[in-house]
């Protein structure tokens, strides 16, 4: 009589939605960084987080950026953004298609449309 004990371990990715929520949290807390050079002619040695008067190195888990994002609300031919002015939005949607987000605080006009069509109904 013999006994056998097998232990198998594996790594598993979290659910995609959990990853999305974690990235969204990181994005909302992302911090601006500046490169620090050892001398004028060298490449940057490391990045530092600039907050008012204090500087610190970012941690490995920090999400950082070196340039501000363009303003996607306004048209910008350089970045290729067409802006949101004049686009249709969904007044009841809380998401990206909703008027509150898409209109960037400029306000919006509501219109009611009546559409008639032949349904090819047979009685």
UniProtKB/Swiss-Prot annotation:
It is found in: Secreted, Extracellular space, Extracellular matrix. It holds the Pfam family wnt. GO terms for biological process: canonical Wnt signaling pathway; cell fate commitment; neuron differentiation; positive regulation of JNK cascade. A motif (Microbody targeting signal) lies at residues 121-123. A lipid is attached at residue 1 (O-palmitoleoyl serine). GO terms for molecular function: cytokine activity; frizzled binding. Keywords: Developmental protein, Disulfide bond, Extracellular matrix, Glycoprotein, Lipoprotein, Secreted, Wnt signaling pathway. Glycans are attached at residue 90. One of its GO terms (cellular component) is extracellular space. Disulfide bonds join 89-104. Palmitoleoylation is required for efficient binding to frizzled receptors. Depalmitoleoylation leads to Wnt signaling pathway inhibition. InterPro entries: Wnt (IPR005817), Wnt_C (IPR043158). Belongs to the Wnt family. Ligand for members of the frizzled family of seven transmembrane receptors. Probable developmental protein. May be a signaling molecule which affects the development of discrete regions of tissues. Is likely to signal over only few cell diameters. This is Protein Wnt-7(I). It comes from Eptatretus stoutii (Pacific hagfish). The lineage of its organism: Eukaryota, Metazoa, Chordata, Craniata, Vertebrata.
